Amino acid sequence: MDTFQVIILALIQGLTEFLPISSSAHLILPSQLLGWEDQGLSFDVAVNTGSLLAVVMYFRHELWSMFKAWTDSIITRKQTDESKLSWWIILATIPAVIVGFTAKDFIETYLRNTAVIATTTIVFGLLLWWADRMFRPGFTEFQVGWKKALVIGVAQAMALIPGTSRSGATITAALMLGLSREAAARFSFLMSVPVSLGAAILVTKDLISSGQTIDYQALSLGIIVSFVAAYTCIHLFLKLISRMGMTPFVIYRLALGAILCAFMFA
């Protein structure tokens, strides 16, 4: 990829990773519109690393408090709000790990296509609208509990289907379970840390074992661009979500799904 492609694709990944609009649906558009080739493993490493650094940096104080409370809970058996939240996030990560390891090849072979992405973009967009309109949530992320955490974790596992959107699926589930908009988003973003870390490790392992030549300039640029885009996106989303709700993202998803359908039948 040339520098322009790296910047555009890293921007797309960074901006869409934490919005409920599906990054995979957007990353398929350059190939459809411009005929760009697959981004390659180096790019995957870059954007996964950039997104991970962004969410860790943004929630650095919360994550540090959670980590200390979690280690204390193991040593002293004392549970606090932060330690409970840590355990719930660990629990919520398990379904995605199981599905990721057992169904990765099936998903990549049979589900990563325009038809699936267009369908899931529309269907899960409508579910997001329903969850946001029909429920009157008020819980915080510290009131999730292990049952709700597991349900949200299952939603995160379902988001391995391209076009679903990890943040979209988890926020939808959290809203249905009674969390406030901001709490649903915060829990979703905190959940992304172990998932993004695991993805970055696995893709890096694949890159090393593939023997591909690493373009360190493109790798560095991709990390920087995706980091800045993702960090900005997280900040603005949390700042505005309570006031504007999910409707703008639902409308956007429906329009994007329609565009992808148009490409299929063109």
Curated annotation (Swiss-Prot):
GO terms for biological process: cell wall organization; peptidoglycan biosynthetic process; regulation of cell shape; response to antibiotic. It is an enzyme of class 3 (hydrolase). GO terms for cellular component: plasma membrane. It is found in: Cell inner membrane. It catalyses: di-trans,octa-cis-undecaprenyl diphosphate + H2O = di-trans,octa-cis-undecaprenyl phosphate + phosphate + H(+). The chain crosses the membrane at residues 1-21, 39-59, 87-107, 115-135, 144-164, 183-203, 218-238, 246-266. Its EC number is 3.6.1.27. Disulfide bonds: none annotated. The keyword Metal-binding does not apply. GO terms for molecular function: undecaprenyl-diphosphatase activity. Keywords: Antibiotic resistance, Cell inner membrane, Cell membrane, Cell shape, Cell wall biogenesis/degradation, Hydrolase, Membrane, Peptidoglycan synthesis, Transmembrane, Transmembrane helix. Its main location: membrane. InterPro entries: UppP. It is a multi-pass membrane protein. Bacitracin is thought to be involved in the inhibition of peptidoglycan synthesis by sequestering undecaprenyl diphosphate, thereby reducing the pool of lipid carrier available. PANTHER family: UNDECAPRENYL-DIPHOSPHATASE. Catalyzes the dephosphorylation of undecaprenyl diphosphate (UPP). Confers resistance to bacitracin. Belongs to the UppP family. This is Undecaprenyl-diphosphatase. The lineage of its organism: Bacteria, Pseudomonadati, Pseudomonadota, Gammaproteobacteria, Alteromonadales.
